[in-house]
Amino acid sequence: MHKLMRYIKGYEKQALLAPLFKMLEACFELFVPLVIASIIDTGIKNEDAAFIWTRCGLLVLLAAIGLASSLTAQWFSATAALGFGAALRKDLFRHIGTLSYSELDGIGTPTLVTRMTSDINQVQNGVNLTLRLLLRSPFIVIGALIMAFSISPKLTLLFIGITIMVSLIIWAIMRVTVPIYHEAQNGLDRVTLLTRENYVGARVVRAFARQADELAAFVETNDHLKKLQFAAGRISALMNPLTYLVVNLAVVALLLRGGVEVDAGKLTQGEVIALINYMSQILLSLLRLADLVVSVTRALASGMRVNEILNTHTTMQDPGTAELAVNDAAEAAKFEHVTFTYKDAGAPSLTDITFTARPGETIGVIGGTGSGKSTLIDLVCRFYDADNGGVALFDHDVKQYSFAQLRRLVGVVPQQAVLFTGTIRDNMQWAAPGASDEEIWQALEIAQAAEFVRGKPGMLDAPVETAGRNFSGGQRQRLTIARALVPKPKILILDDSASALDFATDAALRKAIKEETHGMTVFIVSQRAASVQRADHILVLDDGKLVGDAPHAELLRSCEVYKEICLSQLSKEEVAKTL
């Protein structure tokens, strides 16, 4: 947790003043029982109305100053805690953006969301309560004991005993509940995971009529979380009854012993009332301290989870900002004996892959599900690093390019068409912030998207809702293709990004890309044989191995895997027409 405290930087003054003002409030609070004692022993005893009114005015003044001090402390602590949370959230978001796909795969999206939201909120609340109560509660306990000792050293022993007993009760309850709270936080991760899976895959769930099964799985996970929270809540609920029972018994003992002391003339009635008030102050402070410890314990657990992400350093280092000279005449992409295995996977996803793509070529990539098509493309983009072998673009190892230059060099259209809230123009300018309307329209024409964009009110200024939900699947795919074309990359990757397009639009798209993107190397990843058959050469993958690398006609004669794919999608007559 101490590693996270660097995020308080910039709010040191507020973090210092908050506990100081809380201690100032505590000082005034400690004087209240003495003023009440003086009212009883002097004002009421002597029937001195003026004295009573004067002391009542003093009580109001003490309350007003205490309130002002408390509000000031609350403002300072809230400012520091909110600033701390904002800085931590910003840095965590930035850090997650630096992680490679390997680290993100290992951590998982649901737990990242939980740590970015719930865990940081827990840490933020812990900081807020710490600034307010860490010094105040012990100060009140110690101050009340000193005040009680100044009134009656003998009865102070009772105070010390009660303080120890209440502290032991609080410690015992926390010792049991803290691990349960930690497990509950992990349970929240699992609930978040199931929720995300079901919302993202809602159509699939309904298509297979799995609503009841998914509901049953969610109910089971949610019930487990509920049981953990109930268990912690039931045990925590014992704290107030037990502590109040002990303190009330102590008050009874104090009244009995105090009455004896009053009869003996060793104490006044006002002093006994003051002792009872000090005991109440000790109880409330210990309970607040217990709340603080529970909150801090949760914050520590959440802080460890946040730190776990911050301490996860990417294995994929950016070589820097230096620009490499790109030789346009060199091979656009070259794989040499590349092998890659996903983290914790039992077998390689790609094995001994070797091929060459020249500038201006269109390369088709085809294979069955799980054959390694997307993995191969991810290595071109350097979303992952190969375990063995080398990947080179334009005569430079892909690892030598800075991430910024590599992203300009390679335009990617992923399988899932993702648009962002804003306008069509905003989305088109993601990779090229200074792109003109002419450049955007040119990209839209190539992507077969210009017609429906012109039909939108506002055209380029037409709004895009969250995830592009106000566009159809085919429209989203065409817009993401246009977005990748705007900066005119030297390599364009279409990773099964035309799956929602009809055959005519798909064919028009491939023709436009071929004719309008002179010198651009295009990788078309698809499960459709029709989408890749006109490529200059086609890479055929089967279970992570490259089993074919040739034009369509040659593969039909030499590659059984490719032939099976074609015959599974086309009749023999249709296949014959493609030769």
Language-model regions, residue ranges each:
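Alpha-helical segments in transporter systems
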Residues: H2-M5, K13-L34, R55-L59, Q74-A78, ...
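Transmembrane helix-loop-helix hairpins at lipid-water interfaces of multipass membrane proteins
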Residues: K9, A15-T72, F76, F149-K154, ...
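Transmembrane helices of ABC transporter permease
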Residues: G10, Q14-C27, L129-E183, L254-L267, ...
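An intracellular "coupling" helix at the cytosolic face of ABC transporter transmembrane type-1 domains
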Residues: G10-K13, T98-S102, S118-V127, L131, ...
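Helix-loop-helix
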Residues: E47-T54, M147-G161, A231-R305, I309-L310
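Helix-loop junctions and hydrophobic alpha-helical segments within the transmembrane domains
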Residues: L92, I96, V205, V306, ...
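Conserved catalytic Walker-motif region of ABC-type ATPase nucleotide-binding domains
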Residues: I96, F218, V306, F335-H337
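ABC-type nucleotide-binding domain
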Residues: V326-L579
